[in-house]
Amino acid sequence: MELITKKRLHLISGRSNLPLAKEIAEHLGVELAQPNLAEFANGEVHCRFSESVRGGDVFIIQSHSASEGMTINDSIMEQLIMVDAARRASAKRITVVCPFYGYARQDRKSEGREPITARLLATLFIAAGVNRMISVDLHSGQIQGFFEKPVDHLTAMPVLVDYMRTLGDDLVVISPDTGRVKVAERYASELAADLAIVHKRRVKNKKNVVESKDVM
């Protein structure tokens, strides 16, 4: 009897960071599956996988970033569409790989009548059929709790520390605000470097504008 081997690992990428996906595929020794993404004249996105993913372990890679003429929202929606396609194609398990997780800064209500969009995004992924999420250095660890499925929260710290060590011995690690002090402390400890903290406040009613108050 002839044995038929079926491909179990399917690595699929959206368009926001295709070079990264290609490097991952090369490192794993696998080929990127083709989602055949296309845009209609009205901007809607369509995809259809070139190969069967039935019973397979599907990883869908997409950074939620603005690139290649895409907005963050475009990147997110494109990934959701691919997740839905994989689920409807009977994939056994679907893992979304989000090197940069969109809307991560909106992880709480800082004022009344605001959304918690990082939680909303997690809800959308779960509703689409995601079984697991992988991300790198989330804005805050609490985002892991927004998912009802497992989250692998990776860190690029070892890679960055190795690079920083090539910059010299007289280093100072600066935390841009009090919220990142613990992270800065970890880097300073690994590098045996000094630590500085910037105390700042945001200018009310002005987007992306801050005032630096003190450096400690």
Give, region by region, the residue ranges found by the protein language model.
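PRPP-associated nucleotide enzymes
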Residues: M1-M216
